[in-house]
Amino acid sequence: MASNYRFAIFLTLFFATAGFSAAALVEEQPLVMKYHNGVLLKGNITVNLVWYGKFTPIQRSVIVDFIHSLNSKDVASSAAVPSVASWWKTTEKYKGGSSTLVVGKQLLLENYPLGKSLKNPYLRALSTKLNGGLRSITVVLTAKDVTVERFCMSRCGTHGSSGSNPRRAANGAAYVWVGNSETQCPGYCAWPFHQPIYGPQTPPLVAPNGDVGVDGMIINLATLLANTVTNPFNNGYYQGPPTAPLEAVSACPGIFGSGSYPGYAGRVLVDKTTGSSYNARGLAGRKYLLPAMWDPQSSTCKTLV
C-alpha cells in the first residue's frame, strides 16, 4: 500500500480555530516513532525523474538543483543560514547511516501519454518507465494541468513500492509522486506560499524561487524523500497504523521555523531583496523552505532555524 502524504494543513488549522496557542505547543511531550525492523534506503541511492506534462526548464532546474543539494558539500552552512544538506543530514540519525541521493535518468513525457487525469495505478506504471533498481527511487512529477486521483482532496503526493507486495524490498523499487498544485489547490498543497483554504487567513509567505506551485512541490518532495528513505516499504520508521502512517516529516506538519504554532509556519529567514521566505540554501544560489523533520536522538521535530 502506498503511503500518502497529506500536508496536514487542515489538522493544523483545526487546532488554530479551536483555540490552541503557541504556549500550548511548548508543553507537548516528545514524539515517539517506532522502528518496525524493516529495510531502509541507505548508502548510495539513485533518484530517477519522470516529468509528466509540461514543465519549464527553470521549473525543472529548481527541482533538480534541490535534489543535488541534499548531499552537496559545496554549499556553506551556518547556524544563521543552514544548507539543504544540513537538513538532510538528520536522516543519518535513523538506523543504517547516511542516504546519499544521486540524480540518475530523466524522462520527459510532455505529450500526456496517459491523458490528463491519472488514477493510482498509472502512478505506479509511470514509476517503472525508467527501470529503477532496488537501490533507487523513481520520482513522478505531474504538471499543474494534470489531475490525479485524490490529489487536493486528501493528499499532495505519495510514496510506495512498484512491486505487488509493498512490504518486501525485493518485490519492487521505491517511488514517489508529487503534483503541482498551482492551479488546483495551492491553499492545501503549497501552504505557506498561499493563503489556506480554511482557518486564519494570514498573509502567505513569498516563494523563494518565485513559483508558488514549484516551491510547494519542493516542500512535498522533501517530505516524501525523507519519508521514503526512512520507511520505504512500510516497515521502517513510522507512528500509528501502517495504512495511515506518520513518518519522518509528515509527523511534523506545518512546522518550518522556531516558534511555530497551528496556522503559523514559524520564524524563517527573509531575503532582503525579494522578500521571499526560506530556511535553507542550496546549489546555484537557490533558496528553499524545508519542513521540520523528526530527530530520533531528541524525539522532537527539528527545524533548521
Curated annotation (Swiss-Prot):
Coiled coil: none annotated. Transmembrane segments: none annotated. Glycans are attached at N44. GO terms for biological process: cellular response to hypoxia. One of its GO terms (cellular component) is apoplast. It is found in: Secreted; Secreted, Extracellular space; Secreted, Extracellular space, Apoplast. Residues 1-23 form the signal peptide. Keywords: Apoplast, Glycoprotein, Secreted, Signal. It holds the Pfam family Phi_1. Its main location: secreted. The keyword Secreted applies. Belongs to the EXORDIUM family. May play a role in a brassinosteroid-dependent regulation of growth and development. This is Protein EXORDIUM-like 2. It comes from Arabidopsis thaliana (Mouse-ear cress). The lineage of its organism: Eukaryota, Viridiplantae, Streptophyta, Embryophyta, Tracheophyta.
